[in-house]
């Protein structure tokens, strides 16, 4: 249950245009880490917090604080979130919905310490792609495009992401996942 003090602070921020309380943002991140569910309400809260509290000092964040996927963005935390979503999708396509997915095992590490998680995730992904003869090539191409954005030859993975960058990671993950469902829905309508 939400604290009455937090609810009051959020309402004051909404009505006065003041910054949102950090506790709101931190509680959303804790919930996402606990259940690994990124839904519309949580993504909207992250976006609202970052727009109100962080973009005055980091105007470059505005490019990804949109409603939908920004495929042109080179912002590392956002691209890493997108990459994680594609790795998850490649695993689901190759293996089906298994009991333990990369999201279950690696979401927390990937969103906080990408340098530790992503090399392992990419090794696992090679295994997944080899099992998916139908769609593996497509995922490989999309993943390659994101690795290019990250300058994979140099130092693509930060050792740590700040709390704000973790929010950008989560938004990248959410936007990429929603784009997957949107494209599927659109192609189903055409058939």
Predicted regions and their residues:
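Intrinsic-disorder/low-complexity detector
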Residues: 1-191
């Amino acid at each position: 249950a939400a604290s009455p003090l937090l609810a009051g602070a959020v309402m004051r921020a909404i009505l006065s245009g003041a910054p949102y309380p950090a506790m709101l943002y931190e509680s959303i991140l804790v919930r996402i880490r606990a259940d690994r569910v990124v839904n519309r309400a949580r993504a909207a809260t992250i976006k609202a917090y970052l727009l109100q509290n962080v973009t005055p000092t980091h105007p470059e964040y505005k490019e990804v604080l949109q409603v939908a996927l920004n495929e042109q963005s080179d912002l590392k935390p956002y691209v890493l979130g997108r990459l994680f979503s594609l790795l998850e999708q490649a695993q689901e396509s190759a293996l089906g919905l298994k009991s333990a997915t990369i999201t279950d095992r690696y979401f927390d590490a990937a969103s906080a310490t990408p340098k530790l998680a992503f090399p392992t995730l990419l090794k696992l992904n090679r295994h997944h792609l080899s099992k998916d003869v139908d769609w593996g090539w497509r995922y490989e191409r999309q993943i390659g495009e994101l690795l290019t954005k990250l300058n994979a030859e140099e130092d693509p993975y930060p050792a740590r992401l700040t709390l704000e960058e973790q929010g950008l990671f989560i938004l990248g993950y959410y936007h990429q996942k929603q784009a997957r469902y949107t494209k599927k829905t659109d192609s189903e309508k055409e058939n």
